[in-house]
Amino acid sequence: KVLAADEPLSLQAHPSAQQAVEGFAREERAGIPISSPIRNYRDRSHKPELLVALDTIDALAGFRPAAKTVELMRALSVSDLDPFVNLLAGQPDADGLRALFTTWITFPQPDLDILVPAVLEGAVNYLRSGATEFEAEAKTVLELGERYPGDAGVLAAMLLNRMHLEPGEAIYLPAGNLHAYLHGVGMEVMANSDNVLRRGLT
């Protein structure tokens, strides 16, 4: 199908084959109708996808190296991020990234309402300083914060690779790969499934 995003879309992942089978069975046992808006697993299939850019595309896809995320968070100079910097610096690997992502998406809303604005202020100050290493990331955080105030996905964006595709370039997203399309037009080539797990930017 053709994807045309003129604004950031939801932060999402598609389940693996095993997760799809187990999730579908679990929701069937719970009696959740296939058409229900709270249903996650509408079939038993996994859903890897390939996105081919028809125009330029900006996206977030997959966890960036933990060390780079630590550098980014330190560059924003936000004291409220210090505990999370320490968490990831102490476990600078895929498990540490998943732990931090899980922490943020399960944060109570009152805590998000404090942390997200602090991060946005840090991004503004970073851009005003003239620093450029994380310019694209800081601008993305600001754009998402304006569009989705108080959303944990704004924080999660700091954990993901910021990608830019030119027409004809493509990105492959295996099942389980966390991603969000920000802007652009592309052709999605996917397995035959409607399973989407959304967690942020909604």
PLM-predicted stretches and their roles:
Residues K1-E169, H179-T202:
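Active-site region of the double-stranded beta-helix
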